[in-house]
UniProtKB/Swiss-Prot annotation:
InterPro entries: Mg_trans_NIPA. Acts as a Mg(2+) transporter. Can also transport other divalent cations such as Fe(2+), Sr(2+), Ba(2+), Mn(2+) and Co(2+) but to a much less extent than Mg(2+). It is a multi-pass membrane protein. Residues 1-18, 88-90, 137-157, 211-220, 276-283 are extracellular. Residues 40-66, 112-115, 179-189, 242-254, 305-343 are cytoplasmic. Belongs to the NIPA (TC 2.A.7) family. It is found in: Cell membrane; Early endosome. Its main location: membrane. GO terms for biological process: magnesium ion transport. It comes from the Eukaryota. This is Probable magnesium transporter NIPA4. Keywords: Cell membrane, Endosome, Ion transport, Magnesium, Membrane, Transmembrane, Transmembrane helix, Transport.
Length: 343
């Protein structure tokens, strides 16, 4: 018994200072973005009372200060999220995006008077448990002294193979599947967003590390690799924005959000494990615990989104495809969809 206790202490050395910084930034990001959904929705409702609703093509919300406060809050959250990747591994930062769902659900219940059902409360609890599990067992951030080191990791055969598969699969979906199945199968648009998104997060992390080192006195801006990562970020984000908006415009958000969260987060973790070798610094118990934490978050996310379909305690099955104009006043979606979604 004493030996097993000692081995556990040896395997768990606590969180590094960088991981703590990344955790604080990620949680701050979730707080800002989760709150921004509520503020923006209040602004949209206020604007709709005096002008044309956004869901039917109106832009009166642009004259509503409350909506702009919400957008500013969301921008602060995205900046904090960007900074979090510079300090902590993607395995820690990315799953914590689910915390913003909890913030949104609770604030919607308090401020917007949107009923939070018992299963929604259970979903929030599962997200908290899963997030805590991942935080306590996340790997330490890799020590990197130059953007060249990140470039070397990105150009290793394993990650190059992964990146080639991702790009090939995304191009194949765009060319062959989008024209035929884009409007009928939700997995087409979400698949493109998730594949490209995993590469965008790796590039965002590389760019964040470069900026962190630059601000600490080691200038990384004169390395061409820094600008290559910047170009990749811009290309990937534009692609994500395009196909995510298509998905949200075509399908019900209650369907898009959980599927996208599962695929995006899973592929991002896989990309991080391959590129930064996060799991090489952990034992089997820690890895399995992290996976269990992630599955717990997924379960909570599913429950939260299912409660959107519950009216007066009865479950209503929504059609797979629904007009964005009908669904404009729907519940609070996941941060990564809404942060890229057009108003």
């Amino acid at each position: 018994m004493a030996e097993s206790s000692g081995s556990w202490r040896d395997s768990y050395k606590g969180m590094s200072s960088d991981n703590i910084k990344g955790l604080v930034l990620a949680l701050s990001s979730s707080l800002f973005i989760g709150a921004s959904f509520i503020v923006k929705k209040k602004g949209l409702k206020k604007a709709a009372s005096t002008g044309t609703r956004a869901g039917v093509g109106g832009y009166s919300y642009l004259y509503e200060p409350l909506w702009w406060i919400g957008m500013t809050t969301m921008l602060l959250g995205e900046i904090a999220n960007f900074a979090a990747y510079a300090f902590a591994p993607a395995i820690l930062v990315t799953p914590l995006g689910a915390v913003s769902i909890i913030i949104s659900a609770v604030l919607a219940h308090i401020i917007l008077r949107e009923k939070l059902h018992i299963f929604g409360i259970l979903g929030c609890a599962l997200c908290v448990v899963g997030s805590t599990t991942i935080v306590l067992h996340a790997p330490q951030e890799r020590e990197i002294d130059s953007v060249i080191e990140v470039w070397n990791l990105a150009t290793e055969p394993a990650f190059m193979f992964y990146a080639s598969l991702v790009i090939g699969a995304a191009v194949f979906l765009i060319i062959r599947f989008v024209p035929q199945y884009g409007q009928t199968n939700v997995m087409v648009y979400i698949g493109i967003c998730s594949l490209v998104g995993s590469l965008s997060v790796m590039s965002v992390k590389a760019l964040g590390i470069a900026l962190k080192l630059t601000f600490s006195g080691t200038n990384q801006l004169f390395y061409p690799q820094t600008w290559i990562f910047t170009l990749v970020v811009l290309t990937c984000v534009v692609t994500q924005l395009n196909y995510l908006n298509k998905a949200l415009d075509t399908f019900n958000t209650a369907i898009v959000s959980p599927i996208y969260y599962v695929m995006f987060t899973s592929l991002t973790i896989l990309a991080s494990v391959i590129m930064f070798k996060d799991w090489d610094r952990q034992n089997g118990t820690q890895i399995v615990t992290e996976i269990c934490g992630f599955v717990t978050i997924l379960s909570g996310t599913f429950l939260l989104h299912r409660t959107k379909d519950m009216v007066e305690g009865s479950s209503v099955i929504l059609p797979l495809r629904i007009s964005k104009h009908i669904n404009e006043e729907e519940g609070i979606p996941l941060r990564r969809q809404e942060s890229l979604r057009s108003p």
